[in-house]
Swiss-Prot record:
The keyword 4Fe-4S applies. Binds 1 [4Fe-4S] cluster per heterodimer. The cluster is bound at the heterodimer interface by residues from both subunits. Disulfide bonds: none annotated. Pathway: Porphyrin-containing compound metabolism; chlorophyll biosynthesis (light-independent). This is Light-independent protochlorophyllide reductase subunit B. GO terms for molecular function: 4 iron, 4 sulfur cluster binding; ATP binding; metal ion binding; oxidoreductase activity, acting on iron-sulfur proteins as donors; oxidoreductase activity, acting on the CH-CH group of donors, iron-sulfur protein as acceptor. The gene is chlB. NCBIfam families: DPOR_BchB (TIGR01278). CDD domains: Pchlide_reductase_B. Component of the dark-operative protochlorophyllide reductase (DPOR) that uses Mg-ATP and reduced ferredoxin to reduce ring D of protochlorophyllide (Pchlide) to form chlorophyllide a (Chlide). This reaction is light-independent. The NB-protein (ChlN-ChlB) is the catalytic component of the complex. The active site is at D295. The lineage of its organism: Eukaryota, Viridiplantae, Streptophyta, Mesostigmatophyceae, Mesostigmatales. Its cofactor is [4Fe-4S] cluster. Protochlorophyllide reductase is composed of three subunits; ChlL, ChlN and ChlB. Forms a heterotetramer of two ChlB and two ChlN subunits.
Amino acid sequence: MKLAYWMYAGPAHIGTLRVASSFKNVHAIMHAPLGDDYFNVMRSMLERERDFTPVTASIVDRHVLARGSQNKVVDNITRKDKEERPDLIVLTPTCTSSILQEDLQNFVNRASMNSNSDVILADVNHYRVNELQAADRTLEQVVRFYIEKAKNNNDLDLIKTTKPSANIIGIFTLGFHNQHDCRELKRLLQDLGIQINEVIPEGGSVSNLKKLPKAWFNLVPYREVGLMTAIYLEKEFKMPYVSTTPMGVVDTGSCIKEIENIINSYTQDKISYDEYIDKQTRFVSQAAWFSRSIDCQNLTGKKAVVFGDATHAASMTRILSKEMGIYVICAGTYCTHDADWFKEQVQGYCDEVLITDNHTEVGDLIARVEPAAIFGTQMERHIGKRLNIPCGVISAPVHIQNFPLGYRPFLGYEGTNQIADLVYNSFTLGMEDHLLEIFGGHDTKEVITKGLSTDSELRWTSESENELRKIPGFVRGKIKRNTEKFARQNNVTEITVEIMYAAKEAMNA
């Protein structure tokens, strides 16, 4: 356990609550002390939904510590059963309340006797896994519970649909542009003549989970959530799944070809989506011709750093490198549990790979390599602001501006257009900045400081500061840093104009 003011992936119970609150008519009860119950506020603030978050906190207070939690937890479950009449109630502790080592499964068994709803305890180790791993596990647990229940009741529907159909697994609340991606995936599958069987967990009903085996295959757009469920369904019903994320022109084409192979394995009448892929790539997606335009060629060779969850960071790295000719100096992910897969995906597309969930390491790396742009999470956006480096947000965790009301998918062919816009608009055009400084429009009185840590031992003279102001803004920060680095190496505490020129000569040598 470590103290941090920023975490890329939250504690396990947040993942469980995200899955539970994504389903329709499912209620979650969180057995937690005050302070752990921030999920309701977070979801209400970020997700642009009209419904209340279906999560109740069963607070661990001094009375509970004195008498035990059983009565309070059981009462909360039975009360919510009567008030809300949900199909399912999910009970989850937090890492704090887990310290009490209570037999919560016994509480669930007791509450089930007096409830019309199904009641389950989230089967998650709160000390070993993070938010994303817990979400993946909880989704698989809920699916398994209802598949087993349908088997016992002999009403499991195993007859495949007449037309090709798919389940989309892993779209859930607080995901990065998940709602928009879901719409784009539905449109893509519809274009391919494939029906949507179920979308889970977002907007799905637990009573329909027994219909999952009717689909011809499962589509898992994000590795972080849904993969365990797809593997379970493959093992149980021999259902194939596609886990290639359709992000970018190349990977969207690869995903469609995988779907084509699966459908052809079911039917005698072979189909080909080559014509569709060609048409979409050349005429519908603007990204392919844009990448060959003079605007995009101006970005060729520019340095970028990519950091985010494994799915988005790996896809973005390949898009920048393969499709846009941008030099990815470092690609990284905070999904430390998926490090091997990530390294395999970005191999050959970047110079350096960073696997860490410590934001200070990411900040230090960005300050060291000085990229022209960053593509990361909300945290990298903060780092970019401090270093005056533009940042495009491509992965959760994100803030309110990345829950847009307008249609902004990152997957499919429309997603390629969004990504092309994001990439192009993220890079600062040096001449534009320079002209703004010459003709006005920016406050250029203060020298821009680029550095994560302030160096108080170095002092710039007024003459050297005036000299620094004459340098164009798009290279000024770099020259300032190089001069300060030279001064430290030579034990100089006061930076004069002469030191600036000496530093320049040393760099050119």
